[in-house]
Amino acid sequence: MAIALLAPLTRGADLPADRRRGWQELSLVSPAQAQQAFTTALAADPADRESRLGAALAWLQQRARTPENVAAAGRLLEALRRENDGDDAGIGAAYYLARIAQVHSFTPDRAAALAGYRELLADHPGHPYAQLAAPKLALLLLYDDVPPDEWERRVAEIQALIPRLTAPEALRDTRLTLAMALIRLRQDHARAYPLLASCLGAGTVKRMPRLNTVLVQAAESARILGKESEAAAYYANFLGEFPQDAKSDEIRRRLSRLETKGHP
């Protein structure tokens, strides 16, 4: 299970040794060792809120997801948020409580997750954990069975959120989530294409298989919209990045047709 590890790792030299070791073990997906390190850190300083946050995440990272482990994490996170909802640990706790409601709980609560993400973005918009919440919020809002007018209101909410995002990864993921929902659920290439193009233009889509998928989708959307030179550029980019991909032969044919059409 992926865990987003943020603030405690950015001040490595200043961290107490056991707390630092705990976060390092979490980053290596070693929850038992992380829990041991955080227990030692808390024995030395029971008020260490970042070690308490780490201990909660170690429960969530256990390979065996059980109601007991999720409940243990939830209790630690609730206490952190209740004591102080404005420091790094309290804001992190709010984020992970929303994640529990969305994906970790054995009885997921979409409404609680939505409320948690919205509250983070409203109260702490520039905080890294709030930025992480943005694409999660988009996913929950857009992939829900709601009437068309409500779905459009949700699209508008995400569109209004995008200019407030400052973390490149959060901006990329939120744009891509919206773009793919527009295509998959509405076949709305006109609104989706600028989102795809902006991500590719910013150079923030780098890893396979995401780059593979986004290049093909941007090319297809551009082609459908009659932007043939842009479609050809994306197809050519794809072939340069992934010459041996299983789709390469078909992409070459599509590129050839566009080039032939442009040069009769």
Give residue ranges: language-model regions.
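N-terminal leader/linker segments that initiate helical-solenoid repeat arrays
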Residues: 2, 6-64, 68-71, 88, ...
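TPR repeat positional signature
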Residues: 18, 52, 56-59, 94-97, ...
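Residue-level recognition of tetratricopeptide repeat
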Residues: 23, 57, 61, 99-102, ...
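Structural motif corresponding to the intra-repeat A-B loop/turn of tetratricopeptide repeats
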Residues: 28, 62, 67, 104-107, ...
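Short solvent-exposed coil/turn linkers within tandem alpha-helical repeat scaffolds
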Residues: 41-51, 80-91, 106-107, 121-132, ...
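TPR/TPR-like (Sel1-like) alpha-helical repeat modules
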Residues: 114-123, 135-138, 228-246, 253-256
